[in-house]
């Protein structure tokens, strides 16, 4: 009988129960015991759902209060010195939260650890901080307690832990200047591996048979030293009394396959959604007693699986491997919403095309039964339902828009060229008259409960359109007056009408669909509800012009029009899988171009097109980068094609480590780029040491993801550090991201300090 299992389940709960509990605890509205009880209840519900679907094992260790990498970092006791962790005491939950967000109900506030994207997904992990000679110990008991929880409920468990090489590769430290693959990090294995051995021994003592060790860096281009380190590390772990399932995902093993096949592990999981072509090579390379876990259900998108195609692919493998073939999703289901049954307002046709985490478990079970030759009525009806849904989707008239097809065919003839930057910036400065070190914010201002209530009441029909518009205009005016009072130079309207920087636009574009409970975790307690792009994209009417032109009418200072860029909308949506992603992105660019030109006609002098996701779209293998960058840059330029030279185009990128793609960033030719640099202490500016970035740049001077108010001198120091590599005439002063998640008191204090920092810089250079 084919074993089915899961690499990980969404931890947030179908109704975001974890988010609400954690935030209530942070706010002092819930005790630690109440928070822990919520965690236990969620884990029990998730294990029950997975077991009910027929999984042989339930995963344990996929639950996290903030982030699974942070959980593992604290288990290892790798707590940075500024958090004052006693060496002999367990790491507390509050210390974990302070590492993630800078503060917690107990303990002194401190600078939060850096946060960055998890491979090429929209999930963020907390970066481990590494120092030479770092020592490790088992400093948290959560993993072992959760194993006991699941066993007490009667489940066979498969603990899931990050692999030692992946954990080190993802870590950073001042001593490791060569980046992720710095070979000096491998010296830490000597202290790290004994703790892994202790963990595996303790799990074995708890009766655990299989442990899943995630090593997703095996989908990357790895230097020889790192490939060699896999052999040394897993040889040392081979003496552990548990069976190891080595899990890889997000791409194929490719040149790392020869490394993996030499490892003394009992099983191997591979992603056959991202890299279906690797199946034959992996099967051929397996040892005679090794298990192959085939990741055939897409863990990163929401479309139903073609089970007939999967069966055709797997049947010869099943005949060859027998019970050594396991089935699983391609990766953790962390990246998809919890349950389609929670969607009561999606139309039946579209809903029939979809599959969320819970439904993917059912698909997995159905596939396993069919592969085992189960010809029962239930299996046959299940397969027939899959076929019918796929056929209906392919033939639906909702998918293709002939007008979009015609625009796509003509888009190659649209000129992307503008005058040289030196000429543009001269015209823009004459029009805008900005001081040195101009100040601005990234776009959003605090989203209060009142603002969220306005949107909710309007959508439910409790507020009329006219009343809603009047109230939103009042919020916009308040934000404009606040910015004038603080002394900012380029203003924003605050985006009170927007629930999310992608969902807002998707609701106004054709080809998009929306869920009510399709939440996925982005970072910590922050969840996002990605739109679903199911068909051709078009803009039926202006989306932002009314709000932006109203905001500009309130002040003589320039107010930025705010748009989300085509690549980011693509990256942060669930994208149709029936055409290349490039084609969908180009459709988005054409729709946004219409909006840009309408904003310009309405008198908006500065237009920001956010592209925070530009780097996360990079393929994991460098050989595939240029093809992606070519179309991503072209789509950005297509979205701004035709604007006047005195209209200033901004773009924003947050948590984008783009040092290695700086030439492509420059090729986007935005007049001003604002980037996240505060958490990384201006590390992202290393790219400018060797590359003379030609246009204006605003390196973020404070971390908006932390509630701590920045110090003026600290921000001045960051800008002086930036000025060592960049022309001071080209520098802007801004936060590193939008202010949506912050409260008003800390926002006001932070922006007052930021404006003072800019004034200090002007005085120092005058």
Curated annotation (Swiss-Prot):
Keyword Metal-binding: yes
Signal peptide positions on this chain: none
InterPro entries given in the database record: Cbl-indep_Met_Synth_N, Cobalamin-indep_Met_synthase, Met_Synth_C/arc, UROD/MetE-like_sf
CDD domains cross-referenced by the UniProt entry: CIMS_C_terminal_like, CIMS_N_terminal_like
Molecular functions per Gene Ontology: 5-methyltetrahydropteroyltriglutamate-homocysteine S-methyltransferase activity; zinc ion binding
Entry's cofactor comment: Binds 1 zinc ion per subunit.
Gene3D superfamilies, A to Z: 3.20.20.210
Active site as annotated: 705
Keyword Chaperone: no
Enzyme Commission code(s) on record: 2.1.1.14
Pfam families for this protein: Meth_synt_1, Meth_synt_2
Annotated positions binding L-homocysteine: 442-444, 495, 610
Cofactor: Zn(2+)
Binding site for 5-methyltetrahydropteroyltri-L-glutamate: 16-19, 117, 526-527, 572, 616
Pathway: Amino-acid biosynthesis; L-methionine biosynthesis via de novo pathway; L-methionine from L-homocysteine (MetE route): step 1/1
Catalytic activity of the protein: 5-methyltetrahydropteroyltri-L-glutamate + L-homocysteine = tetrahydropteroyltri-L-glutamate + L-methionine
Binding site for L-methionine: 442-444, 495, 610
Binding site for Zn(2+): 652, 654, 676, 737
GO BP, one annotated term: methionine biosynthetic process
Family as reported in the entry's similarity comment: Belongs to the vitamin-B12 independent methionine synthase family.
Role according to the record: Catalyzes the transfer of a methyl group from 5-methyltetrahydrofolate to homocysteine resulting in methionine formation.
HAMAP family: Meth_synth
Name assigned to this protein: 5-methyltetrahydropteroyltriglutamate--homocysteine methyltransferase
